[in-house]
């Protein structure tokens, strides 16, 4: 199966927020509609700190990828972090995720992004095999700690 990947804009807000709500419910994340809107609206309006790509047909997307950007001394420039990736359950395991990440990687590389990272959570994450298959490698040099500033 082949899926188009298109950068989402403000006209995609309703569908993006709906897909995000499904992902957050599936992952049992505590985010509400107000939080999702606060996160997505700036990116859909073109904020350079991140982007959302819709997967599949524009009228009925199959999922989305949300990437945030950061500057990396180690990489020598801009890097992307996959904050969220979601695919409707009915279309999973058909190669669409692989195609999607390839298309997003090509677009980011063309835009000068040096590396694309994904926080995969626990070492026993069932998606680890997927990440390895699509070319991501474990980074044993990095552990992340966080100070919540707001």
Feature names for model-found ranges:
Residues 7-77, 83, 107, 138-140, ...:
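Acetyl-CoA-dependent GNAT
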Residues 70, 88, 121:
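Residue-level recognition of the GNAT/N-acetyltransferase active site
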Residues 109-120:
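Conserved GNAT acetyl-CoA-binding A-motif
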Residues 98, 122-141:
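Conserved active-site alpha-helix within GNAT-family acetyltransferase domains
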Residues 92, 118-127, 146-149:
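Conserved beta-strand-loop-alpha-helix junction that forms the acyl-donor binding cleft
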Residues 15, 35, 99-100, 126:
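Charged catalytic carboxylate motif
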Residues 87, 93-106, 133:
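Conserved acetyl-CoA-binding loop-helix of GNAT-fold acetyltransferases
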Residues 2-3:
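Extreme N-terminal starter segment of soluble prokaryotic enzymes
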């Amino acid at each position: 199966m082949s899926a188009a990947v298109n950068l989402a804009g403000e006209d995609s807000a309703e569908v993006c927020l709906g897909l995000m709500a499904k992902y957050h419910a599936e992952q049992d994340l505590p985010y509400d509609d107000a939080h999702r809107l606060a996160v997505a609206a700036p990116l859909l309006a073109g904020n350079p700190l991140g982007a959302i790509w819709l997967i599949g047909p524009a009228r009925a997307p199959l999922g989305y990828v949300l990437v945030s950007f950061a500057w990396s001394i180690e990489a020598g420039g801009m890097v992307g972090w996959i904050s969220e990736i979601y695919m409707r359950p009915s279309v999973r395991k058909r190669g669409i995720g692989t195609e999607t990440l390839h298309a997003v990687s090509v677009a980011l590389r063309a835009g000068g992004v040096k590396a694309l990272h994904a926080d995969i959570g626990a070492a026993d994450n069932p998606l680890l095999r997927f990440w390895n298959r699509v070319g991501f490698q474990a980074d044993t040099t990095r552990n992340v700690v966080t100070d919540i500033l707001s």
